[in-house]
């Protein structure tokens, strides 16, 4: 991040990230003074199944809400099924069993993997074939898409602040999050360590490493 973002209150400006800036950043992160971390933004193109995106777009921490444009530092644009035809679908490697003590979690695998895969594949194939036939007969894409499963891949252009992305990683790269979105959070972490290495490492020291202990 730009060290000047840390010192707005003092009117200071700098182009270098010094040890002093590093200590200040860690102090601000530790004591939850997050506003300086909303000035840095990343724009990403994300391809993910619809059921993952439904969880993703709920993340709003780190978004400016005090202006007349409440999402001015956060943008979300998705490919529309009204204009394009869907043709790519997520296929899981295995089928997990429902957790015995957590209504929203999974644990282990379904014992009959072969039958689970057949049931899943048959249902997917039926909806996809019906969608394609509806398109062929001239039905409007905006209507035909309504029968597609949540495994359909969509693409999103996502612009978010540094804080917003850190919050996403903290909540989704975590044992109780759904496995599929955990995988995206881990990729995001690698991206942020490359784009903002110093500040991301500090965030990791304060929050992620402590979370794993």
Task: Identify the function of each model-found stretch.
Residues 1-213:
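Family-specific signature for flavin-dependent thymidylate synthase
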